[in-house]
Amino acid sequence: MFKINENYLKLQGSYLFSTIGKKVRTYKEENPDKNVISLGIGDVTLPLAPSIISALHKATDEMAAKETFKGYSPDLGYEFLRSAIAKHDYEARGVQIALDEIFISDGAKSDSGNIGDIFAENNKIAVCDPVYPVYVDTNVMAGRTGEFNYTTGKWSNVIYMPCTKENKFVPSLPAETPDIIYLCFPNNPTGSAITKMKLQKWVDYAIEKGAVIIYDAAYEAYISEENCPHTIYECDGAKKCAIELRSFSKNAGFTGTRLGFTIVPKELTSDGVSLNSLWARRHGTKFNGAPYIIQTAGAAVYSPEGIAETREQINYYMNNARVIRDGLLEAGYQVSGGVNAPYIWLHTPDGMTSWEYFDYLLQNASVVGTPGSGFGPSGEGYFRLTAFGTYENTLEALRRIKNL
């Protein structure tokens, strides 16, 4: 009889956003006359920029001609895209990244789950608490997390690093030594950012302890404060201890188009074994490459027109973030985020739990957000709102919330 991967049976309920979706569908069925506004899941609402659409059309036409047709892409991705990434995302910030250290993928979510394939099962992970659920759930699937404690809401073999109002939602170095450290800045869900000085301490710590940092920089384009690094490789020594995940979803609207990349420096080794070589082997074996059409669109993001157009979209979303943040503060809420990230993290009022506030907002304002407890134990009593809606819906949602 064949056997299943029993680690999947340890996963707690359904994926957070699936649960939210079910609740919202039920509410809509029971209240067909209500106009529900979602400030929940972080999906963009603006269309792809004109220069990106133009590149998509051109590449599509190329696929119709024998002379310009493209099949499988190179394992690492097309050089024209990797060169643009190296130049604009790294060289422009004083960081040198070799083209064979850049691995094109179909998104940061895939890579954040897949990167665990190159690490042994008995590695101990450390995560921020609250945290993007994919980091923990994919390690549950891999058998690294131990057993779930229903009382504490924690896994026995996971080091939780609390992110609280007291530490401005940036974790302290853990007392227990981890092997793999997951960091995400600007942070999802709290919207917090990390200064270069604080991130350097994490790099120094990882080198000292022989740990590796998985650094999710999917929201770096939203950074507005100069003392916050856009890449972990701005820190001295980071190439010896860090893998960086990047995405085109939030900076260029590719949530439905799917494109991202991962940086694995050749300096990063374990017992003399190159993680770059391991990831290249894994990448070439399990992934046939992002489509040529999509990679061409990705390269257009770095054109002068693409840079200007995507910056305009980012400014649009960050204006929404300002509307949410200012409106909530005016209504007496305790909030953070919304300055270097498109997420606003609010303390639930009147002692409500995260899910109680979710139901309260849905039932009384027809507004959807994300319960903080879905991101980890330290998220209880908090709630996430996103700035990815339309400006008009954002204004209306805040009007409803302020009138409660």
Curated annotation (Swiss-Prot):
Q: Which cofactor does it need?
A: pyridoxal 5'-phosphate
Instruction: List GO BP terms, alphabetically.
Output: lysine biosynthetic process via diaminopimelate, diaminopimelate-aminotransferase pathway
The GO terms describing molecular function are: L,L-diaminopimelate aminotransferase activity; pyridoxal phosphate binding
Keywords for this protein: Aminotransferase, Pyridoxal phosphate, Transferase
- Where, in this chain's numbering, is pyridoxal 5'-phosphate bound? Y72, A108, K109, Y132, N188, Y219, S247, F248, S249, R258, N288
Q: Which residues carry this modification: N6-(pyridoxal phosphate)lysine?
A: K250
The source's superkingdom equals Bacteria
> What's the protein name?
LL-diaminopimelate aminotransferase
